[in-house]
């Protein structure tokens, strides 16, 4: 799985990066999927690797097509483009779901929605963290202890972000399949 945040691709492994480039090249060769630069920097692109045309994840999302279209969620081949969502967007989505299903644990729903709610501060934070890590890539021999601690804190923060991104597809799949069972 690979995620594009703020126009920068973060791959969880080399195979995912290779697979995405290969599939993107195939789609571009038949003019089916636009070049990456056509994707807005504010968007988050989640690629679903190994999915088939009848992938339950995509089919479940398409069941909510009208609402998702209003939220500017875009399907491009096997790519799902999720624009940045604000607090009002999340509130509207929760309200939309409440009107269609009976949930006993709306707090859990809100928590899951937060996982797909990224804002500009997240993008800024993740990029600044990478920049600071690169700045310390070849530290001098006299590097101070507090700087080393800072590096470890940044690495821990980045690992937390990667875990959140890695769980995104799983959480969304579980959440949407759960919704469909309630309809």
UniProtKB/Swiss-Prot annotation:
Induction cue: Expressed in the late phase of the viral replicative cycle.
Keyword list, A-Z: Late protein
Domain of life where this protein originates: Viruses
Family that this chain belongs to: Belongs to the asfivirus S183L family.
Name of the protein in question: Uncharacterized protein S183L
């Amino acid at each position: 799985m690979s995620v594009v945040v703020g126009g920068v691709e973060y791959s969880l492994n080399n195979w995912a990066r290779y697979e995405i480039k290969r599939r993107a090249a195939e789609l571009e060769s038949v003019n089916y999927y636009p070049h990456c630069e056509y994707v807005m920097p504010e968007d988050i692109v989640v690629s679903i690797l190994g999915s088939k045309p009848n992938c339950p994840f995509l089919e479940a999302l398409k069941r909510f097509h009208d609402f998702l279209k209003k939220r500017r969620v875009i399907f491009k081949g096997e790519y799902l483009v999720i624009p940045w969502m604000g607090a009002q967007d999340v509130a509207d989505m929760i309200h939309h779901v409440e009107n269609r299903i009976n949930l006993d644990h709306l707090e859990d729903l809100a928590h899951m929605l937060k996982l797909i709610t990224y804002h500009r501060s997240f993008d800024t934070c993740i990029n600044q963290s990478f920049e600071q890590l690169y700045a310390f890539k070849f530290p001098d021999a006299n590097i101070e202890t507090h700087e080393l601690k800072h590096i470890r804190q940044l690495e821990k923060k980045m690992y937390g972000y990667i875990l959140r991104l890695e769980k995104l597809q799983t959480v969304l799949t579980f959440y949407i399949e759960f919704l469909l069972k309630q309809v």
